[in-house]
A protein has these predicted regions:
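Beta-propeller blade signature
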Residues: 169-188, 235, 312-333, 374-384
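Short, conserved, GDST-rich strand-edge loop motifs in beta-rich repeat architectures
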Residues: 156-175, 297-321, 364-377
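A short helix->beta-strand "capping" segment at the edge of beta-propeller domains
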Residues: 21-46, 335-340
Length: 384
């Protein structure tokens, strides 16, 4: 399963990108990342495709309305529309996040209500409420839950009792270094933690770096973890119900803008001190059969960021246009084959990699400043 933003030169530049010279260690490869097909969905407004389920060959999408979700077939035709209730005996209060598909069922989390499974007709078929008070510091991406033996695993939430003052300092000093996953036996309600915090992360440097936005990609017994503003990721292996650290993998990108951390005593000034700091970051990671593809950008130089008025919509669009996205390609053993492969501009990448090796990305209407009759998703593929 799964997991947003993005000038014009020539129209062709959106569909085919030439390669940048790479180091001699990987110069024997000649990959390109190109649009090979598209998906046009007859829908008025914004429609975000969240996930694809190979067992049912269906997409899950979020529509315009707050709780409007749709199940689409692989051609983009609507199979069913669901609107989760906000009142009544089956009311769901609060944001639904994260949400995805697994084996023909919709799985999601609602803060302080727990985890849910629904069928495509909107019928609730399973619910589990955590046996303690908790919260998440910010939004999540990835799957809502991960089966782990007879238990379920999910990104570890914070207990309410960790809040010791009015600032978030105490929370983050405790978060940095803690295991990533919580594991719960839903019968006995017995819990434990696994997936140790990765070594050599910038979030372990003793500074305040805000929330890590941990994102997990699971493929069989292999788990991949990456954080916001890190140009590397970590691989874990599942064994005996534990998710153990295996290795760190670098994108080997030396010219990315570095993130700025601040001392914890200056935490309240973080936004002001980092106002013009737009560091490089990983946007998505895709695990194919014999390769790993990583979408990333290198950030925006401070001198350019200072020139943009972020209070205006046009300024925010300009910032996105300044971000050039790239692909890094690794083999199945995480050896880097090629990096800095340019990505067509104006796309918002989903977490979806199809069985045909195609990555789904939304054509960003604000980027192109156009009004289309359809919601357009492009299918991109690594070509050699």
């Amino acid at each position: 399963m799964k997991r947003l933003l993005l000038p014009c030169v020539v129209a062709l530049s959106y569909f085919s990108c030439s390669l940048k010279d790479n180091s001699s260690a990987i110069e024997s490869y000649d990959y390109s990342f190109e649009i090979v097909d598209s998906l046009q969905i007859d829908y008025l407004g914004s429609l975000w495709i969240i996930d694809f389920d190979s067992s049912s060959q269906s997409y899950l999408a979020r529509g315009n309305r707050d709780r409007e979700f749709m199940v689409l077939d692989r051609n983009g035709m609507t199979l069913s529309t669901l609107e989760f209730p906000s009142d009544g005996p089956y009311a769901l209060y609060g944001p639904i996040n994260p949400i995805g598909l697994r084996d023909g069922e919709i799985e999601f989390h609602v803060m302080n209500l727990g985890f849910f499974r629904y069928d495509f007709n909107g019928n609730r078929i399973w619910q589990y409420k955590l046996p303690f008070n908790y919260f998440y510091i910010n939004g999540l991406s990835g799957d809502a839950i991960y089966p782990l033996g007879d238990a379920i695993a999910f990104v570890r939430p914070e207990r309410a009792e960790v809040v010791t003052d009015e600032s978030l300092t105490s929370i983050f000093e405790g978060v940095y270094g803690q295991p990533i996953l919580e594991v719960i036996d839903t019968v006995s309600n017995v819990g434990r933690e696994t997936m140790p915090f990765p070594p050599n992360s910038m979030y372990s440097d003793g500074n305040f770096n805000y929330w890590m936005f941990p994102t997990i990609i699971r493929s069989g017994k292999e788990w991949i973890l990456y954080f916001r503003n890190e140009m590397k990721f970590w691989v874990y292996q599942e064994e005996g119900g534990e998710v153990n650290f295996d290795r760190e993998v670098s994108l080997e990108v030396d010219d990315a803008i570095k993130p700025i951390g601040v001392p914890f005593e200056k935490e309240e000034d973080y936004s002001e001190l980092t106002e013009n700091n737009y560091p490089g970051t990983i946007r998505e990671i895709y695990r194919a059969k014999d390769k790993i593809l990583v979408i990333y950008h290198k950030g925006i130089p401070e001198e350019l960021a200072r020139q943009v008025d972020r209070d205006e919509a046009s300024g925010r669009r300009e910032l996105e246009k300044l971000k050039q996205y790239y692909v890094a390609v690794f083999d199945g053993e995480f050896n880097l084959l090629q990096n800095d492969i340019p990505v067509p501009k104006g796309l918002i990448f989903t977490t979806i990699l199809t069985e045909d090796g195609e990555i789904l990305a939304l054509k960003h209407p604000d980027f192109f400043e156009t009004e289309d009759d359809f919601v357009v998703y492009y299918k991109l593929k690594l070509l050699n």
